[in-house]
From Swiss-Prot:
UniProt record similarity statement: Belongs to the prespore-cell-inducing factor family.
Region annotation (Disordered) ranges: 727-750
Main location: membrane
Keywords: Glycoprotein, Membrane, Signal, Transmembrane, Transmembrane helix
Protein's name according to its UniProt entry: Protein psiO
Gene coding for it: psiO
Length: 750
């Protein structure tokens, strides 16, 4: 920004050196105001045949800094009782007053009292009175928008109006049809001035509503429908608090014609009024006179259509190509069974999530309906293999083999191995005692090479003889103790598997598996139930799948699956991130918390440590140039404009701002007008060196005006075709001793 301003200063200085020799007194002061065309059909406060009185105290005495339009003191109306300011001010429909000075083009064109209006731009040009030194505007028959807006013959007359008023010509105005003139309109001008405390005045005479605010304080209060009334304001008389010398203030002018019985206006001021034109070219405008919500409409519900920010387009240069479009981001659905999407015709919508049978690797199968919290529900395809499951790939389940189970048990060749879906790996003796004959033991030979030779029957005839005539428990084998003594021994029932309960009953040896319920499985190395997490996998990226061991009242152990929704923000210290988990779109997703600025002059940002929006004053930069002043306007945001300088003799000299250099600080100086106005003595001739040190009024970037030499200023104005003429050098209004009226001022023109 600073570099752009420096470059502009260099360019303007070269212009000044080429064309400037002296200052000339501006003959006009031109500003672009907004005219809001009105019609009694849309707003019956116009052409209303109520009383015609000058009515004070209709509007609030303090102008809202953000709205910058007058507001009624009351919305009450008592027509029958004929009381109250709104009655005497013929404000019979107070709720529509807000559309006197604000755009309402989107209101219904077919309905009565919809408040619809038609904003138009108008150049308000004040002419220098070289005798008084004031800038004046005077029209006895003032119709600035004849043939325009609602008065344009091409405007489509609402059918309801034709039905209600079949004999009244829309274009001749409904209140009387006295002429083709457009009597129903309101003018708004928001501007600024620097108060120099040198006798500045603001004088007005006209009919119907006139309200003028200085420093957002009501100083001219001529409300209601009335004949021409006068208000003369000496700024030095403004108190509570008084205006401060060399301070910049707002000047806001509001004027309405509401009845077809005359239209006159006369304005005279010595204020050095200036503007920061918006991209519509309107003095201190907010852009709404040429860009509204409908201007940038692209008929795509999936885009956010906005007018450009103030200052992003050169003054008066707005086109629809400057509109700003951004993509609508549809909010993430908390319902996992709905998927958000944007329809170009209808905007954000949702569609049901289609739960496909089988996920990407085909290892899961859908069951049941979609769960609003968890989304699509899937069963692990390989759950049927229970504790023999080793996972899934490409839809193929991997199952424990006998070889793998053999490894778990140490590859003992005396057993046959397999995997049981409930028990996991199990083994069976190859040399079963049930195959043994009487008085023999079936033993296993580990070192043989042929499986057919693995089992060998060993005779225990001697032991049988010792127990002859004795009853031996079926779970025991005969044995000998002392000579001739029968001493049975227990059968070997241990299968060396810690995950089985070995038992012999009535001679039958059993190996009952240790029961581990749910998602638990017995660890063959420890004999304890341990978790088996794969069983709990629900194929949902938004859940944490865990298996926990729970002891039942009977002492048994069960594994319980848990599919807790994942907290995406658990490891994020930035609380400005808004997290959600979309099971149908990759899992955790975050968006930054958006803090809306509460006003144009406050910037709101999210504080990462708290997640709260924190407001701070907006900083407005003017590049450090002495001849530029920046401020934040509650309605417009950051604006940058030229510094106004008071001259030593306002009638004979112009106040000129000189930017600082490396060796000299910026300052204001006085330069004689050339030619000098009548009555001014010849003074020092301004040098090229002085001119080269200043800046002229010009638009830079965000509607910036740079001040300086008058010739350079005139050169810029000639090329711009339209401008704020004389903003830097209006001569002082010369007061008389009788109530502030200039003796040479022609009062007959009022």
């Amino acid at each position: 920004m600073k570099e752009k301003i420096k470059l502009s200063l260099l360019i303007l200085t070269s212009i000044i050196l080429a064309v400037a020799n002296s200052q000339t007194q501006p003959k006009t002061l031109a500003m672009t105001a907004t005219v809001y065309d009105q019609h009694t059909f849309y707003n019956d406060n116009f052409e209303n045949q109520g009383p015609a009185y000058l009515t004070k105290n209709m509007v609030v005495s303090k102008l809202d800094k953000t709205l910058k339009i007058p507001q009624l003191v009351s919305l009450d109306i008592n027509v029958e009782g004929k009381t109250g300011v709104n009655y005497f001010g013929t404000m019979y429909n107070p709720k529509l007053f807000k559309y006197f000075f604000s755009e309402n083009t989107n209101a219904s064109p077919d309905d009565k009292n919809s408040g619809k209006n038609f904003p138009l731009l108008m150049d308000l040009i004040l002419t220098l009175n070289e005798t008084s030194g004031a800038y004046e505007f005077s029209k006895q028959e003032y119709f600035p928008i004849n043939g325009k807006g609602f008065n344009d013959p091409s405007y489509k007359v609402p059918p309801k109006y034709k039905a209600d008023s079949p004999n009244v010509d829309w274009f001749k105005m409904a209140g009387g049809g006295y002429s083709q003139n457009n009597y129903n309109y309101c003018i708004k001008l928001n501007s600024k001035f620097t108060y120099f405390n040198k006798g500045e005045v603001f004088n007005f005479r006209g009919d119907d509503d006139v309200w003028v605010f200085i420093d957002n304080r009501l100083v001219v209060d001529l409300g209601g429908l009335h004949t021409a009334e006068t208000a003369n304001i000496k700024l030095k008389d403004i108190t509570n608090p008084p205006l401060q010398t060399n301070k910049i203030y707002d000047l806001d002018f509001f004027y309405c014609e509401r009845r077809a019985t005359g239209s006159s206006i006369q304005l005279s001021t010595t204020l050095e009024i200036f503007c920061v034109d918006d991209y519509c070219g309107v003095c201190n405008g907010d852009g709404t006179s040429c860009c509204t919500s409908s201007t940038c409409e692209d008929n795509n519900a999936c885009t956010i259509d906005k007018c450009p920010k103030l200052g992003s387009v050169a003054p008066g240069k707005f086109t629809k190509d400057d509109c700003v479009y951004s993509e609508v981001v549809c909010p993430i659905e908390s319902n996992q069974c709905l998927r958000p999407y944007c329809d170009p015709k209808e905007g954000c919508k949702t569609s049901p999530v289609e739960c496909v049978n089988g996920n990407i690797d085909k290892c899961f199968e859908q069951f049941g309906s979609c769960d609003s919290s968890l989304g699509c529900q899937y069963n692990y395809k390989c759950n049927a293999y229970g504790k023999c499951n080793l996972g899934c790939s490409g839809g193929q389940c991997k199952v424990k083999t006998s070889e793998q189970c053999s490894e778990e048990f140490g590859n003992d060749p005396c057993y046959t191995y397999s995997c049981d879906v409930e028990l996991g790996c199990v083994r069976t003796e190859k040399c079963s005692q049930e195959d043994a004959k009487l008085c023999t033991i079936n033993t296993c030979l580990k070192n043989v090479t042929r499986e057919d030779d693995r089992c060998e029957l060993v005779s225990i005839q001697e032991e049988c003889n010792c127990c002859a005539g004795h009853t031996v428990d079926p779970c025991q084998l005969p044995g000998c103790g002392e000579p001739g003594e029968c001493k049975p021994v227990d059968k070997i029932i241990d299968d060396n598997n810690l995950c089985t309960i070995d038992k012999c009953e009535n001679g039958t040896i059993t190996h009952t598996p240790v029961k581990c319920g749910g998602c638990s499985i017995c660890d063959s190395k420890t004999g304890q139930c341990v978790i088996n997490p794969p069983i709990c996998d629900d194929d949902n990226v938004c859940t944490i799948d865990t298996c926990s061991l729970v002891e039942n009242p009977n002492g048994s152990i069960d594994g319980v699956c848990s599919n807790k929704i994942f907290d995406c923000a658990s490891n994020d210290t930035d609380l400005c991130n808004i997290w959600t988990c979309d099971a149908n779109n990759g899992g955790c997703q975050s968006i930054k918390k958006v803090c809306d600025d509460p006003s144009p002059c406050l910037v709101s940002k999210c504080e990462p440590s708290t997640g709260q929006c924190v407001d701070s004053p907006r900083t407005c930069d003017h590049g450090g140039a002495f001849c530029l002043i920046s401020e934040c306007d509650e309605r417009l945001g950051c604006i940058v404009y030229n510094r106004q300088c008071a001259s030593d003799n306002r009638k004979c000299q112009a106040g000129v701002c000189v930017n600082g250099t490396s060796s000299e600080e910026g300052h204001c100086t006085s330069v004689d007008y050339d030619p000098l106005p009548f009555g001014c003595n010849t003074a020092a001739v301004v040098s090229t060196a002085v001119i080269a040190g200043v800046t002229v009024a010009a638009v830079v970037g965000l509607g910036i005006f740079l001040y300086g030499g008058k010739k350079g200023y005139d050169y810029y104005q000639d090329n711009k075709s339209k401008g704020m003429t004389g903003a830097n050098s209006n001569p002082l209004y010369k007061e008389s001793g009788n109530a502030g009226q200039n003796p040479l001022y022609n009062d007959n023109n009022l």
